Amino acid sequence: MVKNSFISAISQEEKEKNKGSTEFQILNFTKRIRRLTSHLELHKKDYLSQRGLRKILGKRQRLLTYLSNKNRVRYKELIGQLDIREPKTR
């Protein structure tokens, strides 16, 4: 994965206005997850990073669940833009 790849899911103006929005938080978690995943491909025994990755995955999952309950249309758009798999339902 290219280190400087940028996910342009939310426009620059929206980023300046809505830094606390659910979509922006999910975007930031996704960027951190991809960066940590590429790090763990090189450093397989970095267990602290693995733990951090699992924590971030859980936080992003909770935010995605919240967004899907509040606004299903925005949830579907965001998943499509960020290329995230839809979670399995229990």
UniProtKB/Swiss-Prot annotation:
A GO molecular function for this record?
structural constituent of ribosome
What superkingdom does the record give? Eukaryota
InterPro entries in the cross-refs: Ribosomal_uS15, Ribosomal_uS15_bac-type, uS15_NS1_RNA-bd_sf
Q: List the disulfide bonds.
A: none
Q: What is its main location?
A: plastid
Q: Carries keyword Ribosomal protein?
A: yes
Can you list the GO cellular component terms from the UniProt entry? Answer: chloroplast; ribonucleoprotein complex; ribosome
Enumerate the Gene Ontology biological process terms: translation
Where would you find this protein in the cell?
A: Plastid, Chloroplast
- Is Ribosomal protein included in the keywords of this UniProt record? yes
| Keywords (A to Z) from UniProt | Chloroplast, Plastid, Ribonucleoprotein, Ribosomal protein
Q: How does it assemble?
A: Part of the 30S ribosomal subunit.
Q: Which family does it belong to?
A: Belongs to the universal ribosomal protein uS15 family.
Q: What is this protein called?
A: Small ribosomal subunit protein uS15c
Q: Which organism is it from?
A: Piper cenocladum (Ant piper)
> What is the phylogenetic placement of the source species in the record?
Eukaryota, Viridiplantae, Streptophyta, Embryophyta, Tracheophyta
